[in-house]
């Protein structure tokens, strides 16, 4: 027996060592994996997909597990339940959660888009469109309480219209069915995201006549949120994530729409190149893509004002309570 132990001793030691290495490797892999849930899969988030396709996250040693949350409520639920490390969603979601005084503090630490991403689609081309033309019309709109709808109502008020009084806003259609509903005859106008708006225009069934993003100003429209506890436990992961994102943002800011479209084509296999380029170009022209992850206080306050005017601000949450600029500041400074 002793002889057998001596005979297999070296092999047993090597096996134990190999298992130890495997365990360490597995632990390291798990530590560097980030479960990211996006509120929807959209061309509006091009810098994120560029960061993935160009390998910027991998350069930071991060393995991104990307999931479509299919809506703001579901996306926030995955974060609060611990099924996501980071979520990409409207900043208003963090305000709603914080205002409810839950035991789980949520912070916004990086910004991806800085304008609304919807467009006004008409049934007929209107070369000299004015927002006042919506008076007395039926607008196929977005759901109540979401940023797209609040921005729509803000733009209407700025242009002398009273939402729901001067403009009949239709809000009983699910987000995913808005494009089809408009094509089928619902509404005189529709507020639509890309690429739905451009596809309808390409088919000659509608015409983009105005941009809600262009006429509502800059605000932290879509941001990355995480639990404050997760940020404290994984500051290195948060900083590396933000650094990779910043690389993607800078790449999009310095490359033409054609190259951006080519870089993210694999993420949108069902969208033609022509539509991809057109959509990216529109978003670049109106500066929808934030060039840095830094969430500015002035833009955050603009968001609060839009929510307040819409009657959807449950509580005014101070900038410093909701926004963590530590990691964005560091990566922009090159740290």
Where in the sequence are the language-model features?
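Bacterial N-terminal signal peptides that target proteins for export
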Residues: 2-13
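Conserved C-terminal helix/tail region of periplasmic/extracytoplasmic solute-binding proteins
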Residues: 303-335
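C-terminal motif of bacterial Sec signal peptides marking the signal peptidase cleavage site
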Residues: 21-23
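Soluble non-cytosolic domains of exported or imported proteins
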Residues: 69-73, 88, 142, 146-147, ...
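Short, glycine-/small- and polar/acidic-enriched structural segments
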Residues: 32-164, 168-172, 181, 188-194, ...
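Pocket-lining segment of extracytoplasmic ligand-binding domains
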Residues: 93, 124, 165, 174-268
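Secondary-structure end/capping motifs
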Residues: 232-314
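Bacterial lipoprotein signal-peptidase II cleavage site
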Residues: 25-32
């Amino acid at each position: 027996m002793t002889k057998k132990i001596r005979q297999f001793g070296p092999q047993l030691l090597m096996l134990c060592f190999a298992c130890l290495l495997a365990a360490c490797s597995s632990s390291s892999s798990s530590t560097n994996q980030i479960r990211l849930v996006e509120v929807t899969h959209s061309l509006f988030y091009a810098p994120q997909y560029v960061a993935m396709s160009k390998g910027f996250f991998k350069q930071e040693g991060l393995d991104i597990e990307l999931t479509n949350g299919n809506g703001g409520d579901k996306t926030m639920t995955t974060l609060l339940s611990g099924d996501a490390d980071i979520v990409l969603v409207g900043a208003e979601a963090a305000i709603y959660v914080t205002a409810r005084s839950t035991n789980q503090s949520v912070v916004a630490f990086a910004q991806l888009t800085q304008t609304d991403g919807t467009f006004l689609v008409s049934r007929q081309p209107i070369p000299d469109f004015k927002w006042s033309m919506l008076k007395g019309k039926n607008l196929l709109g977005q759901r109540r309480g979401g940023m797209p709808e609040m921005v729509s109502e803000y733009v209407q008020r700025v242009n002398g219209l009273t939402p729901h009084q001067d403009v009949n806003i239709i809000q009983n259609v699910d987000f995913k069915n808005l494009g089809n509903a408009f094509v089928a005859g619902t509404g005189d106008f529709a507020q639509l995201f890309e690429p739905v708006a451009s596809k309808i225009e390409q088919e000659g069934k509608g015409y983009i006549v105005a941009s809600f993003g262009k006429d509502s100003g800059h605000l932290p429209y879509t941001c990355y949120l995480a639990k404050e506890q997760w940020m404290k436990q994984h500051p290195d992961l948060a900083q590396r994530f933000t650094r990779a994102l910043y690389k993607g943002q800078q790449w999009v800011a310095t490359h033409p729409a054609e190259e951006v479209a080519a870089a993210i084509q694999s993420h949108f296999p069902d969208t033609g190149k022509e539509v991809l380029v057109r959509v990216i170009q529109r978003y670049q022209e109106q500066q929808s893509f934030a060039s840095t992850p830094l969430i500015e206080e002035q833009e955050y306050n603009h968001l609060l004002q839009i929510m307040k005017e819409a009657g959807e601000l449950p509580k005014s949450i101070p900038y410093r309570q909701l926004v963590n600029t530590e990691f964005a500041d560091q990566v922009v400074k090159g740290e």
